[in-house]
C-alpha cells in the first residue's frame, strides 16, 4: 500500500467498510518516519509490514514523493472528521509524524516559503554510494514522476498548504490555539 493512494482513497474505503484497514495503514506510515530517512516514511509498505522492495533499498536509497507527508496529514484529519476516531489526531505516533512533517521535514527538504523556489532538485544524496538505485527519485517534488529536473511544482505547494491547514485544525481541536495560529501563518507565507 502506497502513501499517495491510501491518502487519496481513504474516505471511499471508509464507505466500503474498511475503517480498520485505513487506521492500520495510516499507523504504519506515521510510525515509520525517521531522521535516518530525512523525515520521510516508507513510500510503499508490503503485506509483511516491510518497505516495498520495488521502492526501497536502504534508508539512504529509496523512492519518495515529497507530497506524501502532507497528504497523510490531510487524510488523517479528514478521517477524523469522517469517523470521529481520535487515533487519527491524538495517538502519539500520529502526533509525532505531524510535528516532524510540519517542522523538521520542511526544513530538511527546504520546503519553506523563502527557499522552495530555489531548492536543488536532488538533495541528501551521498555521492560515496556507488550507483544508488533511486538517486533522482528520493525526494521527488511532485506526483508527476516522468519529468526530470523539477524543484517545485503546483501539486507540492498545494499539498503543503493543505497539510499545514489540516495540522493547524488538529492543533485547534487539541486546544492549542497558539500552535494552530503558528501553522496557519506558515500557510500564508
Question: What positions do the PLM features span?
Answer:
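Substrate-binding groove/exosite segments of carbohydrate-active enzymes
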Residues: 1-77, 81, 86
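Short, glycine/acidic-rich beta->alpha junctions
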Residues: 2-5, 71, 97, 152, ...
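Long, well-ordered core segments of solenoidal/helical folds
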Residues: 17-40, 81, 94-114, 185-189
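The feature captures the catalytic groove of carbohydrate-active enzymes
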Residues: 44-71, 86, 106-184
Amino acid at each position: 500500500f502506497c502513501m499517495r493512494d491510501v491518502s487519496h482513497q481513504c474516505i471511499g474505503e471508509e464507505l466500503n467498510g474498511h475503517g480498520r484497514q485505513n487506521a492500520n495503514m495510516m499507523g504504519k506510515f506515521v510510525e515509520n518516519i525517521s531522521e535516518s530517512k530525512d523525515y520521510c516514511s516508507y513510500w510503499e509498505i508490503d503485506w509483511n509490514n516491510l518497505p516495498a522492495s520495488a521502492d526501497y533499498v536502504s534508508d539512504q536509497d529509496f523512492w519518495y514523493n515529497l507530497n506524501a507527508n502532507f497528504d497523510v496529514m490531510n487524510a488523517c484529519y479528514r478521517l477524523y472528521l469522517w469517523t470521529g476516531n481520535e487515533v487519527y489526531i491524538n495517538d502519539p505516533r500520529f502526533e509525532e509524524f505531524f510535528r516532524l512533517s510540519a517542522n523538521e521535514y520542511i526544513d530538511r527538504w527546504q520546503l519553506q516559503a523563502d527557499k522552495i523556489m530555489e531548492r536543488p532538485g536532488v538533495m541528501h544524496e551521498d555521492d560515496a554510494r556507488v550507483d544508488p538505485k533511486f538517486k533522482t527519485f528520493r525526494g521527488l517534488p511532485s506526483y508527476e514522476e516522468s519529468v526530470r529536473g523539477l524543484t517545485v511544482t503546483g501539486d507540492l505547494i498545494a499539498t503543503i498548504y493543505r497539510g499545514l491547514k489540516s495540522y493547524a485544525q488538529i492543533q485547534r481541536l487539541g486546544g492549542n490555539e497558539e500552535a494552530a495560529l503558528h501553522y496557519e501563518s506558515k500557510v500564508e507565507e
